[in-house]
């Protein structure tokens, strides 16, 4: 199959939406192919069920224009550095051949988010090694970036989502079981104005870069600009 332009990994369905739903909506609108891979079924979530979370994830994907969404059904709160997990992620990377890969940032209050980042980084490296899992052809990812979930970190670069912030909110609100308390739900950090907090963060990043709303990202290596510093073409 032809490769994806972007493949975003999350520990749980809704992680990717929190960090970069606006960016995904922006690029799918421009015709780029974007995929999402959730590592767990979030079966230990305080609210919702596995079946409901899957339906919510499908709805959010439709809102963002994502046609490819996978779930590897790894254990919730069990994302440790295991070879079997790395191999599963390598298979996904080699199958979908993404140009860019995104994962959560390492610094996050939820250990699964940080461990997801580490597993994906290991898998990206191994995916490019020809003799590692030789039954599947290798694939080298061009760039690896991190999005934010619970943190307010200083980003290395931002993407303008001013025209897509409403889609981001809509994608997040698709996870009704997580961001609102139903009759049988319990209060969690996600149900107490979490979506509003995320939007406020993107507004703050937007203000810092001179737009209405922006999503912030981190990169281990320098990012090459595709426009010069005074706004012209490279």
UniProtKB/Swiss-Prot annotation:
Copy out the cofactor comment: Can also use Ni(2+), Co(2+) and Fe(3+).
Q: Which PANTHER family match?
A: N-ACETYL-ALPHA-D-GLUCOSAMINYL L-MALATE DEACETYLASE 1, N-ACETYLGLUCOSAMINYL-PHOSPHATIDYLINOSITOL DE-N-ACETYLASE-RELATED
| Originating organism | Bacillus anthracis
Q: Which residues form the signal peptide?
A: none
Q: Which reaction does it catalyse?
A: (S)-malyl N-acetyl-alpha-D-glucosaminide + H2O = (S)-malyl alpha-D-glucosaminide + acetate
Q: Which family does it belong to?
A: Belongs to the PIGL family.
How does gene deletion manifest? Deletion reduces bacillithiol levels by 30%.
Name of the protein: N-acetyl-alpha-D-glucosaminyl L-malate deacetylase 1
């Amino acid at each position: 199959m032809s490769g994806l332009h972007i493949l975003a990994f999350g520990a749980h369905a809704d992680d990717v939406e929190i960090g970069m739903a606006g960016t995904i909506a922006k690029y799918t609108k421009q015709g780029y192919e974007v995929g999402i891979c959730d590592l767990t079924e979030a079966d230990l979530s305080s609210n919702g069920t596995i079946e409901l979370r899957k339906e919510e994830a499908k709805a959010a994907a439709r809102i963002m224009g994502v046609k490819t969404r996978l779930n590897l059904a790894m254990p919730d709160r069990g994302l440790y550095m295991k070879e079997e997990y790395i191999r599963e992620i390598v298979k996904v990377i080699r199958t979908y051949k993404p140009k860019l890969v995104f994962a959560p940032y390492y610094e996050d209050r939820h250990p699964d988010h940080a461990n997801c980042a580490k597993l994906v980084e290991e898998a990206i490296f191994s995916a490019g090694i020809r003799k590692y899992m030789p039954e599947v052809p290798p694939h080298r990812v061009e760039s690896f970036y991190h999005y934010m979930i619970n943190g307010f970190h200083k980003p290395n670069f931002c993407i303008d989502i001013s025209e897509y912030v409403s889609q981001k909110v809509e994608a997040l609100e698709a996870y009704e079981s997580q961001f609102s308390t139903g009759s049988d739900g319990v209060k969690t950090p996600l149900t107490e104005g979490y979506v509003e907090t995320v939007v406020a963060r993107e507004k703050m990043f937007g203000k810092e870069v001179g737009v209405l709303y922006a999503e912030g990202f981190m990169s281990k290596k320098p990012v090459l600009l595709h426009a010069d510093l005074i706004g012209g073409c490279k």
